Amino acid sequence: MESVVQPSVFVVDGQTDIPFRRLEQNHRRRRCGTVQVSLALVLLLGAGLATQGWFLLRLHQRLGDIVAHLPDGGKGSWEKLIQDQRSHQANPAAHLTGANASLIGIGGPLLWETRLGLAFLRGLTYHDGALVTMEPGYYYVYSKVQLSGVGCPQGLANGLPITHGLYKRTSRYPKELELLVSRRSPCGRANSSRVWWDSSFLGGVVHLEAGEEVVVRVPGNRLVRPRDGTRSYFGAFMV
């Protein structure tokens, strides 16, 4: 009779859940590692914000110390600068041009354009060639005239120069007073057949009272060339 072979059977009595416990421990370790990394990042961010706040606080304190040591006038320096700029913009000023066809007055001062092109009046008035001040003070007055002719002008051959001058009219004196005068002659470089060109510029600071007038005179006014208003001009502004 044939014998039957039975398979071997092994019986384990305890610790049947060891593999499952190991898997659970690995998951817990991973979760703890993630929490630790997140906490470290939060701590670094907090430290950075704290450092930045400390530097800003120190900067604010240093600026406060600097301002505290400034003189009283220094605290309002920017306001004073702005006020000065505004006051300069409001100062009396005028620029007149020679673009007007009536530039040359017969027997009188040169006449000027007050509105067209670059010409303007601000805080000053104009009357028959004269700039009239409305406020007393120091003014920079200036004038430029473009001169032209053919050969030596009649009357200059004897050595008399062309006179270009700024003159003041005041109620305290019966005659015009010289402020600035230039004298020049083209006869040394001109002959009877050639056209010559020349220019004269005057400028300086003078004191004027309210109501006083400043005019420009060129006795040989037929030599003045108005042109386009940029060659001959007259102006003043308070300094």
From Swiss-Prot:
GO BP of this protein: cellular response to mechanical stimulus; immune response; positive regulation of myoblast differentiation; positive regulation of myoblast fusion; positive regulation of non-canonical NF-kappaB signal transduction; positive regulation of T cell chemotaxis; T cell chemotaxis; T cell costimulation
Cysteine disulfide links: 152-187
Changes after translation: The soluble form derives from the membrane form by proteolytic processing.
Spans within the Cytoplasmic topological domain: 1-37
Residues of the site described as Cleavage: 81-82
Spans within the Extracellular topological domain: 59-239
Protein name, per record: Tumor necrosis factor ligand superfamily member 14
One protein family per Pfam: TNF
Protein purpose: Cytokine that binds to TNFRSF3/LTBR. Binding to the decoy receptor TNFRSF6B modulates its effects. Activates NFKB and stimulates the proliferation of T-cells. Acts as a ligand for TNFRSF14/HVEM. Upon binding to TNFRSF14/HVEM, delivers costimulatory signals to T cells, leading to T cell proliferation and IFNG production.
Gene3D superfamilies according to UniProt: 2.60.120.40
Annotated glycosylation sites: 100, 191
Any one GO cellular component localisation term in the record: plasma membrane
Keyword Flavoprotein annotated: no
THD domain boundaries: 92-239
Subunit note: Homotrimer. Interacts with TNFRSF14.
Protein species of origin: Mus musculus (Mouse)
Localization: Cell membrane
A molecular-function term among this protein's GO annotations: cysteine-type endopeptidase inhibitor activity involved in apoptotic process
